[in-house]
């Protein structure tokens, strides 16, 4: 709920903001079991009720048919009795028809295709560009084919299916390439050994035996790749249940430390949808942040690990050093997890890097951070003028050079700060970015545009977007904390 009304039929959020202020002309669809009232669903902006009294798979509680939906017979009865306006019904129908015609009811829409080689290529490329290199001491990565003859892969996530589970994020793929399969195809079966090391289901395995076997095998390997992280089980990267710990589950942290003690040439690949604590970080020379990369995960992983693809991903969020550095945990239990009924949103607009910047709390890995197998240098940023009107567009440019020996891509970022805001504002905010591909030794002039109206913030008292007449500073950087040059306008 938000301010006492369920979000699926919240008058302020749906009618006032979404449909009136933003001019949204599409259809609002409820979450499964998100509808709770015919009165509110009829008048507060909900257009399509879905999955009432189900979790998407089975009925919850009493028997319930489609006719029992809040927007079915109860709504029809209210319309006939004059309790609900027909104009609201007409609006719902228009929105649903508009959605249909925009999608599958277009007679001229070409036939689609499923699971083609082209789809696989796109999935692999997205995965490759998303992987983030976070640490790479002494050139641990890339591991070129032929560099080692005895490579040990440890970790359940190297073989576990990560397209299924998690609720609504589940994929139904034609095939799924695991990281282990991708690595074996890249380096050859004879060079890759595998052991689980830990398990998410201790009832089926002797946990200590798994750990001891991994430690013993690590001593005999030339290089160790630990592939772990989270999965889509309950209380991890799954809808409906919050995580209960910030640490890696299944004692993975202790296992990483023990593997590193047995073999100093141990690199870590974390597969997860969000951050984890890393007390073991100093004990390993290299770390990659991977994600749930879909059907081609194994090929994407192997291509980046081997150097066939140069990593170019940047962190889409900040990873705090400890849980208490996160804004939601700074204000105590009233902010999270709340009192069982209410959660007080104390941090306001200071979320993620805005919190770390404004409160001067260093992140372990900041928003926008990501390494490469090459190095980039930034020239000084310049703007086309110094004074702008509210309808103008800021044109900025800088030179970006690849100073290394291999091709790569850099996602350059532009942040903006305001000198004297009238309301609380973060130290700076991301306003533009561009990923630039450069060959070894190549340099390019990078140009970006920022409409002045993008500098606006929302004044809740005026209920409008406001651009103050003030001095703003543009910052060009490789991450939210790695600023290369700044220009005031």
Task: Enumerate the language-model features and the residues they cover.
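Long, well-ordered, tryptophan-enriched scaffold segments
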Residues: 45, 62-105
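C-terminal non-catalytic regions of proteins with extracellular/luminal or membrane-system context
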Residues: 3-9, 15-16, 20-24, 29-38, ...
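Conserved alpha/beta enzyme-core scaffolds, especially Rossmann-like or related mixed alpha/beta domains
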Residues: 89, 106-110, 281
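Short acidic/histidine-rich active-site segments
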Residues: 24-61
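Active-site-adjacent bridging/hinge elements
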Residues: 104-107, 420
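Short, basic, helix/turn surface patches
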Residues: 54-64, 87-92, 224, 294-300, ...
């Amino acid at each position: 709920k938000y301010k006492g009304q369920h979000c699926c039929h919240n008058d302020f959020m749906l009618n006032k903001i979404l449909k009136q202020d933003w001019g949204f002309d599409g259809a609002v669809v409820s979450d499964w079991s998100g509808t709770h009232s015919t009165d509110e669903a009829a008048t507060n902006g909900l257009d399509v009720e879905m999955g009432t009294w189900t979790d998407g798979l089975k009925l919850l509680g009493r028997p319930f048919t489609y006719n029992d939906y809040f927007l079915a017979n109860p709504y029809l009865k209210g319309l006939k009795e004059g309790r609900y306006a027909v104009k609201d019904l007409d609006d719902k129908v228009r929105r649903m028809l508009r959605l249909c015609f925009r999608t599958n009811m277009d007679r001229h829409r070409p036939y689609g295709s499923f699971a083609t080689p082209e789809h696989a290529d796109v999935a692999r490329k997205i995965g490759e560009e998303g992987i983030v290199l976070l640490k790479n001491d002494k050139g641990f990565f890339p591991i070129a084919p032929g560099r080692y003859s005895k490579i040990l892969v440890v970790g359940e996530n190297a073989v576990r299916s990560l397209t299924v589970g998690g609720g609504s994020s589940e994929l139904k793929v034609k095939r799924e390439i695991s990281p282990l399969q991708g690595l074996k195809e890249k380096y050859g079966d004879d060079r890759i050994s595998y052991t689980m090391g830990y398990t998410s289901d201790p009832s089926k395995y002797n946990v200590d035996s798994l750990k001891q076997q991994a430690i013993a095998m690590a001593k005999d390997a030339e290089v160790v790749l630990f592939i772990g992280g989270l999965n889509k089980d309950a209380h991890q990267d799954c809808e409906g249940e919050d995580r209960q710990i910030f640490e890696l589950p299944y004692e993975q942290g202790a296992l990483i430390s023990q593997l590193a003690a047995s073999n100093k040439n141990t690199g870590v690949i974390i597969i997860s949808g969000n951050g984890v604590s890393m007390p073991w970080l100093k004990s390993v020379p290299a770390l990659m942040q991977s994600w749930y990369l879909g059907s081609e995960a194994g090929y994407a992983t192997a291509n980046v690990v081997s150097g066939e693809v140069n990593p170019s991903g940047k962190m889409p969020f900040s990873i705090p050093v400890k849980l208490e550095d996160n804004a939601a945990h700074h204000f105590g239990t009233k902010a999270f997890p709340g009192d069982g009924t209410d959660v007080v949103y104390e941090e306001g607009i200071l979320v993620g890097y805005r919190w770390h910047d404004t409160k001067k709390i260093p992140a372990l890995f900041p928003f926008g951070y990501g390494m490469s197998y090459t190095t980039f240098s930034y020239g000084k940023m310049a703007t086309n003028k110094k004074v702008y009107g509210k309808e103008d567009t800021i044109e900025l440019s800088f030179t970006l050079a690849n100073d290394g020996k291999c091709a790569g891509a850099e996602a350059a970022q532009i942040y903006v700060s305001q000198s004297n805001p009238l309301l609380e504002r973060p130290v700076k905010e991301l306003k533009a970015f561009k990923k630039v591909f450069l060959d070894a030794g190549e340099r390019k002039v990078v140009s970006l545009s920022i409409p002045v109206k993008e500098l606006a913030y929302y004044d809740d008292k005026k209920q409008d977007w406001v651009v103050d007449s003030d001095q703003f500073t543009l910052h060009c950087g490789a991450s939210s904390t790695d600023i290369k040059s700044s220009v005031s306008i």
